[in-house]
Amino acid sequence: MSKKQKNETSAKAPVKLTRAEKKEIQAVIRKYKGDGKPHSAQTSIPYEAMYQDGVCRVTPRTFSKCIEFTDISYQLAQADTKTAIFENLCDLYNYLDASIHVQFSFINCKIDPKQYAKSFEIRAQGDDFDDIRSEYSDILQDQLVNGNNGLMKRKFMTYTIEADSLKMARARLRRIETDLLGYFKSMGASAWGLDAKQRLEVMHSIFHPDGEPFSFDWKWLAPSGLSTKDFIAPSSFRFGNARMFGLGGKYGAVSFLQILSPELSDEMLADFLNTENGIVVNLHVQAIDQSDAIKTVKRKITDLDAMKIQEQKRAVRSGYDMDILPSDLATYGQDAKELLKTLQSRNERMFQLTFLVLNTADTRQKLENDVFWASGIAQKYNCSLVRLDYQQEQGLMSSLPLGASHIQIERSLTTSSVAVFVPFVTQELFQGGDAMYYGINAKTGNMIMLDRKRARCPNGLKLGTPGSGKSMSCKSEILSVFLCTPDDVYICDPEAEYYPLVKRLHGQVVKLSPTSKNYVNPLDINLNYSEDENPLALKSDFVLSFCELVMGGKNGLEAIEKTVIDRAVQVIYRPYLADPKPENMPILADLHKALLDQHIPEADRVAQALDLYVSGSLNVFNHRTNIDIKNRIVAFDIKELGKQLKKIGMLIVQDQIWGRVTQNRSKGKATWYFCDEFHLLLREEQTAAFSCEIWKRFRKWGGIPTGATQNVKDLLSSPEIENILENSDFICLLNQASGDRKILAERLNISPQQLRYVDNSEPGEGLLIYENVILPFKNPIPKNTQLYQIMTTRLGEGATV
């Protein structure tokens, strides 16, 4: 203010107010001065600042950070696995000292169903497959409605410390986060720290239970003058009612768990979370300094001893036995001494636990029903769920993952008692992007959506007894690949089961038989056949496998026989490698001649075995390839090859598909290969070794093979089965015979609880193993659909073709 303005101001005569005007002004001041209570939704949210790296200043000297972690399969795990998880969880709690407050938050929040359904939508393309797309989409939508995928289940751990400055807080929070992530990793759970935007999104989901989209950008704050709270707050809070509150257009209520049971179950928390309703469960855990805890227990024992002495004195004065004490006093004394022993001699500490349950609903009646349901869960475990009277606001704010509890209702528990609330139930498999449908989780009802290409090794196996739904499972996956990806699909079909599906998808069926005019040359090769400079090395392995099957015998090929075959291979491919024209491609007759030209007994013996396949009645493979494969989906029907040629036919088909894989690799296209009766390729030593080598190479070249068989014992008895299993991150187990169940449980580390799902299971039900996750699943396909008709192999149910 300038001197002139000051002079002008001072020159003005003071305004005199009447008594009435003074009263009016004082009333206005009182009105707007406030009563110390928040008067906006934003000011009710109890934190001071949120920083971009995810650190939150809750109070001037209190800072918190948040970790999100994934679920793991705990309830169906092996007993020793459950014990290991529990012990690691105890170690995590014991890591916490009295300066760290921890809050576990389990949030079941709804998401926008329309947005969610878009991920399953298969758009019409105006071709002959739109009716299939529509029917397939309807099945996915039905599963979405029947399951509880409308809820997103998320798990968080928020940890809070006190510090004199933000800089000091950040340094310590970072160290704690590193340690906590290590504990989660040891339990098999993925975990990661959240930044500020992610933390705000979590709080937004609690304040907007309907799944309203969250929009926020740091650039918006300065121009708008808004704070981070403005982007997460609901339209209003209403805390007038003592036992519930209003949240925008919703109703909510917070209750606390009164732990009355002498023993706690590790299934209680899982039961609270196993609901189709929106629920938020919070566990606030505060460690007590060990020396303080021991002193407190000792004081209690001293107090109990004093009471015991008083009772004994009273007994003496009254003239009855001084050893007769009130039962409660004796029990409390024993419990206190046992607790002291636990704290002093075992790896146990003391914690204060506050267990809060937040329910939200559209109407008061629905809210009361949800709270009643939650109370029933507590009652099941001999506990009580008590509504927070006149503390609903504090309860709601304590349910935010900020790491601060405003409810002073605590229960003292030891490490193992707190760890009983295991934060894991069962893992879900729900990947976004190009994931495909593989059924529903039999434990939770949620859809299983997977993208096998994301696996370390996408190779797969499908094992099951006859009638267990093995072929149906393969066909369902083939259909998903066809509808959802541009990939090629090849099928080795020993029983002619895939014809209706392939024809309906306008695919190509290549029928191989002694009387067929479709020919496939087993000696076909292309210059991309192997990643080595010389493609003959891998092709020679194939020819050795072919000759092994031709010659038969239990001991396979002898060393000299392998040498003469390899020598012949080098000779017959020279013309083609010099001038790669189709007419220079060798056939079996060329191999036969090259063997005879060596003029040694071992070569003659191999050539004589080849006679039947060169000039005899089984010469179907002594021709150049005359089929032109241009289709996306191709089935090789080898049913009519007969028993003598079946294994040879499967080996040749596998080699043909390997050639297609090498061609597709240069185009950047994935190639799916489904091989039924896969165990036949693993019986003979050389053939098994070649098949295993191809199995390994598929992954590098963009191939995704799937072997299916009902002869699990034969498969598992192969010397190469270990390599096959190690290179297969996708295994679908359907119903299994008793002996097979035991072998599979041992080989694949399946728990007895999980094994129940492959014991007399219905068709299309079993266990899905994806990388390290084992899930029980169901894959029902309605019988009244076109899809069922073209996929079933049951007599009288399939489509007429």
Named regions from a protein language model:
Residues 2-424:
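Extended, folded cores of ATP/NTP-driven motor/assembly subunits in large transport
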Residues 72, 79-98, 109, 271-273, ...:
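P-loop NTPase motor domains
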Residues 462:
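Hydrophobic anchor at the beta1->P-loop junction of P-loop NTPases
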Residues 473:
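Hydrophobic positions on the alpha1 helix immediately C-terminal to the Walker A/P-loop
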Residues 506-510, 720-733:
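A short helix-turn-beta junction within AAA+ P-loop NTPase domains corresponding to the substrate/partner-engaging
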Residues 748-800:
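Conserved P-loop NTPase
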